[in-house]
């Protein structure tokens, strides 16, 4: 278990590998493309029509680009996004990503009790050594804003249902968009229980 924890932490500490080194998006061009996105994600990019839809506003540009590229190629399958990116060039995806990255993020609030929030904070900041779960702060920062240069996403303020869904998909290896990072998210999530995922998602919602 100790070796597994150290291996996971080492992977988390490695520099991110990205298909594109520097962000190249133009927010002004992305704004026009985002009009259709507003139907599901809201005009502000943070008012999804369903509780399991992510906030896009303020999300890190490189992360957004990489996810959109995987969705467009079919590497990441999202039924809700079917057909939405047909005909988009890589530049279009960069522009769209830049537009949302430049929108103000939306703060959320945690709903858990003190005991739940304390436990969640302990996991987020320090991991769970006995289960080989690395601290979330290693990649996503104490504030939950992620690492824009590395392409690690901002988690702060994301809807609870969305975060629960993504951690569960990683745990069950349904989502595999962490291949370029050595499968780190699947390694982190694979031993988390439903209750641990739930309190983490609530805690993350309140980060800012």
Model-inferred region functions:
Residues 17-34, 44-52, 102-130:
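Electrostatic cytochrome c docking/interface patches
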Residues 1-5:
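Positively charged n-region of N-terminal signal peptides that target proteins for export
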Residues 48-55, 70-112, 148-154, 173-198, ...:
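Axial heme c-ligation environment in periplasmic c-type cytochrome domains
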């Amino acid at each position: 278990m100790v070796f597994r924890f150290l291996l996971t932490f080492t992977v988390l500490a490695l520099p991110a590998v990205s298909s594109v080194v520097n962000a190249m998006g133009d927010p002004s061009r992305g704004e026009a493309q985002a009009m259709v996105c507003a139907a599901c994600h809201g005009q502000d990019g943070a008012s999804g029509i369903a509780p399991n839809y992510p906030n896009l506003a303020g999300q890190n540009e490189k992360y957004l680009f990489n996810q959109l590229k995987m969705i467009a190629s079919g590497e990441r399958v999202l039924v809700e996004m079917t057909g939405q990116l047909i005909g988009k060039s890589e530049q279009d995806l960069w522009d769209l990503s830049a537009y949302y990255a430049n929108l103000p993020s939306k703060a959320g609030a945690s709903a858990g009790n003190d005991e739940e929030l304390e436990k969640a904070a302990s996991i987020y900041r320090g991991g769970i050594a006995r289960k080989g779960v690395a601290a979330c702060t290693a990649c996503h920062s104490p504030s939950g804003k992620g690492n824009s240069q590395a392409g690690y996403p901002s988690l702060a303020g994301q809807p609870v249902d969305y975060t629960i869904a993504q951690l569960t998909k990683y745990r069950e290896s349904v989502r595999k968009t962490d291949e370029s990072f050595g499968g780190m998210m699947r390694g982190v999530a694979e031993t988390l229980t439903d209750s641990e995922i739930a309190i983490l998602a609530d805690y993350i919602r309140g980060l800012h």
